[in-house]
């Protein structure tokens, strides 16, 4: 099993990152470099979280082995008469190798590759790719130029901060500049910035995640919040549609002014490809390609203005598409919550859906998750499950807050994480150590990463599921992950006293902390900021518990969901009305589809079968009778008189009623139903088809 656990986790984490990226990104529409860069950033960060428990168990085993090697083994001396025979007692090794043991020399190389690759991504490559993806240039050179200009200030800020650390080290006479110390300064600067963001996000997640599960057990609360989201999303949806209309109007003007032989026509064609299909068709119909451009007669937009317009088109189209998909998802969620509220009082104990699922369900799932099981889960078991999970997560949050405030105390050990790990270390229970480390890091990561997935900066950065996240937001999330994960793991090692700078013991460090270097170069960070700044998580948790941030945003005009607010009540009522309209609209659509399906099943097959039989097997009696009638009429009848001809012409000009089951619907009553044919004539049905089903 040597190294097998490491290989299995490397493969598993890759597919986990790929699955999450597929949920939020779009592999078909987004650029391959964006997908690869984001996947690599997420993959490396998840690797740190999953592999660190193996590093901890391996380090504990190496410490035990080192302590056993330094201790002198007892010897049994047997003296008989004049001859003294010294027989050493058999050495009993008190340590046993863990199942996930990683050989020496592998972990330091692994951590160096993972850490420095992630730092290269977050500080150099991903910011450049972010500006490149957001650029509206029409060529690779133009996009690279724009990205370099936008990142000049960005990179200059980093150089300024790093230069300040260099000056501090150079002025300090006790320190001598070496490559390892310069490397430590860079790592300290990156971890300081990451720890600053980490505490802010952690303080929010420690309270909000348990509270969200507790509120998840309240059906009325979730339904009201969904109505509130519907009202806000409808406003955003209308704003996105209006913004798209304005941008498309500008594109139409540019498209009409720049003709086919203009030098900038290729740029306009590139912009048109980014527009929705219906707008492309409208602009194509209104385009007159036979007019030559006259540079002296008209004023044409410059290439710089087209670049700006291209950027606006990309953003507006993405935002419009995202709001449309989110609106459909929110409707399904609202309909589901309303169904749960109705089924709670059901006496049959069977869950009944108002609308059928748009996606066909698996037969295996339908067999086990039948309406009865669904009713017991949704109406009885799920609320209690959410409450239990909320209590467990609240206990974890209290343990984290207590440990963050007391992890610097070594005598006595007050950090609960350190107490649990040290108890397991005495018995060398490696399975328990790895499980405890993984659950602790996983909970901290969930609190931080879930906040990253939830934050929303003025619609500029937003992670949306169902493949609706744009390239800029994906790259920005990769940058945040790479900046937050290393300080998160260092903070966890400090909570468990596996970091020698916290425990103040001369013990073998983990391979992860060994690549970070000694923080004694920057004592004010190692002994000050790293220890006392995490205590602010208490203040942030209190502020989150009392929703101080939500109240401040509400006062600034950004409506947030608050139960005791008049604005919230108004938005809830508005959202409820919107959901009711959409529900009524969908019901009418389903009723129309059901009516058409019933007419088609009742009359469509009979008509097809009778028509097929009539054409393939004609009745001989009918054919003989028709031939006889034709011969008799042609033989004994002369030309019709004027009265009969007039009556026949009137009958021919009259509109026959169309009783076709496929076309006799509510839609056929509309003036543009498609029944009118070019030339001013309507479709009519022959007498054989009309009376066929009688």
Swiss-Prot record:
* Principal cellular location given in the protein's record: membrane
Phosphoserine: which positions carry it?
A: 633
Basic and acidic residues bias located where? 588-624
Task: Indicate whether RNA-binding appears among the record's keywords.
Answer: no
Coiled coil regions, renumbered to chain: 228-260, 571-603
Mode of membrane association: Multi-pass membrane protein
Enumerate the Extracellular topological stretches: 1-3, 54-105, 172-186, 409-432, 495-521
Matching entries from PANTHER family are given as: G-PROTEIN COUPLED RECEPTOR-ASSOCIATED PROTEIN LMBRD2 (PTHR21355:SF0)
- Family membership, please give it: Belongs to the LIMR family.
Q: What is this protein called?
A: G-protein coupled receptor-associated protein LMBRD2
Q: Which organism is it from?
A: Mus musculus (Mouse)
Gene (name only): Lmbrd2
